[in-house]
From Swiss-Prot:
Organism: Bombina maxima (Giant fire-bellied toad)
Protein name, entry field: Maximins 5/H4 type 3
GO biological process entries: defense response to bacterium; defense response to fungus; killing of cells of another organism
Membrane-crossing segments per the record: none
Family: Belongs to the bombinin family.
Signal peptide range: 1-18
Keyword Zinc part of the UniProt annotation: no
Length: 144
């Protein structure tokens, strides 16, 4: 009789333990689900805020770019425009990270070519413009 009693109590303890483990697993999975849902909500809120900030910066940068385009640009303005364009590319790369490296490489190559052309242009046009300016200055002096 003692043996039957020990087996019955052991069985009850084992089943109670199994139920408690099962309940713990369920509560953990429910907690995980709740945590995951709250993380999703936080991420979506963060994504919305980031999207709003990106939209604001894109609009502000486009406004600055249009302001610079409507007036005569100096070398400093040109450099500032390059920086603004780089920032715009960076903001766009946040939307499409896989294409960013391709776009960046393509932009760098085009920018490098433009810089080389500008340097050649300055070397050729600098002396020509100074000679033309000297000739025009001499003509104006003779006419005046």
């Amino acid at each position: 009789m003692n043996f039957k009693y020990i087996v019955a109590v052991s069985f009850l303890i084992a089943s109670a333990y199994a139920r408690s483990v099962q309940n713990d697993e369920q509560s953990l999975s429910q907690r995980d689900v709740l945590e995951e849902e709250s993380l999703r909500e936080i991420r979506s809120i963060g994504a919305k805020i980031l999207g709003g900030v990106k939209t604001f910066f894109k609009g502000a940068l486009k406004e600055l770019a249009s302001t610079y385009l409507q007036r005569k640009r100096t070398a400093e303005d040109h450099e500032e425009m390059k920086r603004l364009e780089a920032v715009m590319r960076d903001l766009d790369s946040l939307d499409y990270p896989e294409e960013a490296s391709e776009r960046e490489t393509r932009g760098f190559n085009q920018e490098e070519i433009a810089n080389l052309f500008t340097k050649k242009e300055k070397r050729i046009l600098g002396p020509v413009i100074s000679k033309i300016g000297g000739v025009l200055g001499g003509l104006l002096k003779n006419l005046g």
